[in-house]
Amino acid sequence: ADFYRSVAGQYDEPAATIHFRAEGLHEYTALAFIPGARPFDLFDADRKGRIKLYVKRVFITDEAELLPRYLRFVRGIVDTADLPLNVSREMIQDSPLLGAIKKGLTNRILSELPKLAQQDAGAFATIWENFGAVIKEGLYEDFERRAQLPDLARFRTTASGEGWRSLKDYAAALKENQTAIYYIVGDDAGRIANSPQLEGFRARGIEVLLLSDPVDGFWV
């Protein structure tokens, strides 16, 4: 926990830890933490990820942008021996290694989160509560992973109460002959949940997704 706090600059406990070593053409070791609490500046337009880059255990920079913006809440370190110790900022940005690290680290995080959702639904629900609105930015920013990200997404619905529903959950509960996913978008979750527009759907027992995050108007 102390190491996490020194890396993340936070005082909570990590909600999840991801540790792996990549070998082959590009070799590096990565240790990533998903914080247990939401940083106060999570939605700051200028906020960037803070993955610390090390070369042979020597700190180089925390501005290499090793994750996409929608994973900017993740904290951690990457250590590699495949760069020189005197590497310049320009060399870092132009290095094929950095692109490989970004792709590998992003893919690993996005593959570990569904496993966590299966193994510990409560822990994943907390992560989604804190960071779901940011992760959903990837639904319209990350074309490469647009087929993967919807499986991560969780939603409030007219049937979920205070809980979260996945699209898989929603599909499993479709009414007979229902072929569409219904949703309502607005600025306030409570207001759209009580919208008169939903009365007909409730009367027919049709579940509706309640989309109230700022990003929802962009990706639906």
Name the predicted role of every residue range.
Residues 1-220:
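Conserved GHKL (Bergerat-fold) ATPase module
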